């Protein structure tokens, strides 16, 4: 369900889809595993359990939730998801942050000297330097990121155990009606995690070179959407076949185009854009 170019690609595709129901990557993930994946002869999708499907649906508007049946009910009734889904939610967020630290350092967009002022990174940096003063910088960074992840996981497990005991949760229904998430970091670690997020937003995501890449991503996604909406016959056969039942339905066409673009990798999207716009490229 994640578009090429991450959040910038998602925002661009959502803008393109405004007249056709919009685009939410969590809904697209659910659509992929329920409908788009073709692995079985007797049914579409992957036949995943309810709990897995609910965990995929991290965010959802009330309008869309009403169309999803049981899996969307918690957004309407304002109940909590299962513990599995709560774990997945925080695991995804932590994985993104730590990956972006590693990626930002390797790309040179952020520097170790800056990150040392961020508590979550700085504490692990000091410990790694104390234990392994002579290791290469690239190995040191990997070790710091690994320790950051371990630090977060240990705190999450220990604090969540306390939350579950305090809530007296003994069943799925207890979890759903707890009134709050029962999986979470302790307040000090949560504050450290938020500090890292703020740093990444200010120093990495708004870096001028990242902003340039974001703009390129928006152009590629928007151009691809426009080309295929103007002439859906340029879609690959497996996508074009889905339009034969309603060839004049613009909304159906837009959804198929969005499915195609959302399934692309960054590299594939750039290559497809080049094939469609560069006269020297083979189509």
Could you describe each region identified by the protein language model?
Residues 1-19, 26:
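Aspartate-rich (DDxxD/NDxxD/DxxxD) Mg2+/diphosphate-binding motifs
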Residues 19-20, 70:
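Generic structural signal for short, solvent-exposed loop/turn connectors between secondary structure elements
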Residues 27, 32-41, 45-283:
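Histidine-centered, transition-metal-coordinating active-site segments
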């Amino acid at each position: 369900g994640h578009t090429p170019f991450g959040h910038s690609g998602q925002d661009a595709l959502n803008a393109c889809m405004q007249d056709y129901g919009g685009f939410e990557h969590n809904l697209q993930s659910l659509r992929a595993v329920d409908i788009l994946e073709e692995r079985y002869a007797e049914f579409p999708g992957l036949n995943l359990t309810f709990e897995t499907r609910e965990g995929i649906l991290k965010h959802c508007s009330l309008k869309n939730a009403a169309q999803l049946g049981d899996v969307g009910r918690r957004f309407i009734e304002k109940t909590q998801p299962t513990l599995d889904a709560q774990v997945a939610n925080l695991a995804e967020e932590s994985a993104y942050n730590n990956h972006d630290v590693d990626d930002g350092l390797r790309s040179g967009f952020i520097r170790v000297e800056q990150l040392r002022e961020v508590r979550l990174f700085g504490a692990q940096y000091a410990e790694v330097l104390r234990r392994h003063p002579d290791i290469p910088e690239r190995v040191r960074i990997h070790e710091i990121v690994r320790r950051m992840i371990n630090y977060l996981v240990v705190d999450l497990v220990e604090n969540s155990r306390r939350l579950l005991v305090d809530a007296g949760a003994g069943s799925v229904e207890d979890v759903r009606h707890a009134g709050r998430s029962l999986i979470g970091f302790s307040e000090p670690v949560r504050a450290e995690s938020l500090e890292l997020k703020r740093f990444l937003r200010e120093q990495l995501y708004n870096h001028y070179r990242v902003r340039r890449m974001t703009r390129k991503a928006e152009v590629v996604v928007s151009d691809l959407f426009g080309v295929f909406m103007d002439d859906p016959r340029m879609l690959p056969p497996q996508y074009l076949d889905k339009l034969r039942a309603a060839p004049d339905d613009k909304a159906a066409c837009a959804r198929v185009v969005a499915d195609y673009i959302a399934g692309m990798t960054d590299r594939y999207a750039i290559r497809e854009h080049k094939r469609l716009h560069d006269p020297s490229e083979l189509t």
